[in-house]
């Protein structure tokens, strides 16, 4: 077996390799040192902290605005319990993905496979460990989930900006932000999201605490009612939105690949989740306390919070963060497309950006067809997130280490808090059964029922989903007619 140090070796990204290839004189190096250090500080991130910021920033984006809506469907107690429950099992399956990545990496390096100019992805890990059928399964679910994850960010951009400027309808804003988000084609990999991840987490932190404080200061609305849960359809729809919230680890492999020492990732997602709890729980609790059942008809919390400079700042910061999260969701799709057309090892940023553009077009189109901010989260959570980041990783881990020899030679042994392979298998089996029955089964039924109801109510290509009807022009007074 390879040593741990060998398993931890990082793959240098295309940008680093391009910069370091070729000879330079000592004088030239000295001249460029300060500029290089500044550029590296902003552009090249492969540390544990970079991974933590990426995980935390990516995990909580526009869902922050829909969690109060989920609380109105679930009720206060169930909302809090489901957040903690899905946060913990999401952290566990992210840990499983990291273990399988390290196992795959170690086996391939033992075979002297060179990953220069190649970003390892989840479907390749499944292919190397379990074969081509698992590769196809992973590729189908991962790409479809990330596609709709990008769609959701685009819908959220249009939904949010409307609360600052309602002179344009949400569909027009979707056109505009689709063009803006397309600029993410210029970001080569997760290695280059250092400054964006840091800023993104700061933006969501501000927004979460603004929501909590604004709701408390505003107080409860008159005759507020907290009747949830009232219907099974709403209950499981809300639960599935929370499952979606803590299912942001579909990009775990790409984040690990950007690290200098990927094996240190093991508990990063869990630590990121703990921080995310400090944002999602207080904000959702406070907004639901203030507005109660009114949230059932307002999936975006911004629509109920008082309009002022603080809210406008939160909207703008969330817009920027959704641009970042769009890049997080879309970058793995860019990699897949590059590999399909044979351009993945291209070093030119401009050429790579050009060949990536076709990926954005279907995302743009789908965001215009299904502009249902809120309900679409639950539908994606039930049908895609359940398999992509919960069921498939748990099953893959069980099958990879099903033999005694595989367990004996495993690069990563069971964690100290769960030292028995039997306990690991029991936990994995529980996750598979729970998510399959509750998440995919009940959640799928509830989410699709709610989603179809939105289509029946608003129609496909809805011009302005959940917008207030325009105020009819006032008739002129009798005196004005003379």
From Swiss-Prot:
It holds the Pfam family Aa_trans. Residues 1-59, 101-135, 194-196, 254-266, 336-356, 400-422 are cytoplasmic. Its main location: membrane. Shoots and roots of nodulating plants, at low levels. Glycans are attached at residue 297. Carrier protein involved in proton-driven auxin influx. Mediates the formation of auxin gradient from developing leaves (site of auxin biosynthesis) to tips by contributing to the loading of auxin in vascular tissues and facilitating acropetal (base to tip) auxin transport within inner tissues of the root apex, and basipetal (tip to base) auxin transport within outer tissues of the root apex. May be involved in lateral roots and nodules formation. This is Auxin transporter-like protein 4. It comes from Medicago truncatula.
């Amino acid at each position: 077996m390879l040593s741990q140090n060998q398993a931890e070796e990082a793959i240098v990204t295309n940008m680093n390799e391009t910069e370091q290839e070729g000879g330079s004189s000592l004088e030239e190096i000295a001249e460029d040192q300060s500029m290089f250090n500044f550029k590296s500080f902003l552009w090249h991130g492969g540390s544990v902290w970079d991974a933590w910021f990426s995980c935390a920033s990516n995990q909580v984006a526009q869902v922050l605005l829909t969690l109060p809506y989920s609380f109105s469907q679930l009720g206060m107690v169930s909302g809090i319990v489901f957040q903690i429950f899905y946060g913990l099992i999401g952290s566990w399956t992210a840990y499983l993905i990291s273990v399988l990545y390290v196992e795959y990496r170690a086996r391939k390096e033992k075979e002297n496979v060179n990953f220069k100019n190649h970003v390892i992805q989840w479907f390749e890990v499944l292919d190397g460990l379990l074969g081509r059928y698992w590769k196809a399964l992973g590729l189908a679910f991962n790409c479809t989930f990330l596609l709709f994850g990008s769609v959701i960010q685009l819908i959220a951009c249009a939904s949010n900006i409307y609360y600052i400027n309602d002179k344009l309808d949400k569909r027009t804003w979707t056109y505009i932000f689709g063009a803006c988000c397309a600029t993410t084609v210029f970001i080569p990999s997760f290695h280059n999201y250092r400054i964006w991840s840091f800023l993104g987490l700061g933006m969501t932190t501000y927004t979460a605490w603004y929501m909590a404080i604004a709701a408390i200061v505003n107080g409860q609305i008159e005759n507020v009612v907290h009747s949830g849960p009232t219907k099974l359809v709403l209950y499981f729809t809300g639960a599935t939105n929370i499952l979606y919230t803590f299912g942001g680890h579909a990009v775990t492999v790409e984040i690990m690949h950007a690290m200098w020492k990927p094996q240190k990732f093991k508990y990063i997602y869990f630590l990121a989740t703990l921080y995310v709890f400090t944002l999602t729980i207080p904000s959702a609790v406070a907004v639901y306390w203030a507005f109660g059942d009114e949230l059932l008809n307002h999936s975006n919390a911004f629509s109920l919070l008082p309009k002022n400079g603080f809210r406008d700042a939160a909207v703008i910061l969330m817009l920027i963060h959704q641009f970042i999260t769009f890049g997080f969701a879309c970058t793995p799709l860019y990699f897949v497309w590059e590999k399909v057309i044979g351009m993945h090892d291209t070093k030119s940023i401009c050429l790579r950006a050009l060949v990536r553009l076709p990926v954005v077009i279907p995302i743009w189109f789908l965001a215009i067809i299904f502009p249902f901010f809120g309900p679409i989260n639950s539908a994606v959570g039930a049908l895609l997130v359940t398999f992509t980041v919960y069921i498939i990783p748990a099953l893959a881990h069980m099958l990879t280490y099903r033999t005694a020899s595989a367990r004996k030679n495993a690069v990563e042994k069971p964690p100290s808090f769960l030292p028995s392979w039997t306990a690991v298998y029991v936990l994995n089996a529980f996750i598979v059964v729970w998510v399959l029955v509750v998440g995919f089964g009940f959640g799928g039924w509830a989410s699709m029922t709610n989603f179809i109801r939105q289509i029946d109510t608003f129609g496909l290509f809805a011009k302005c989903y959940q917008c207030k009807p325009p105020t009819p022009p006032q008739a002129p007074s009798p005196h004005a007619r003379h």
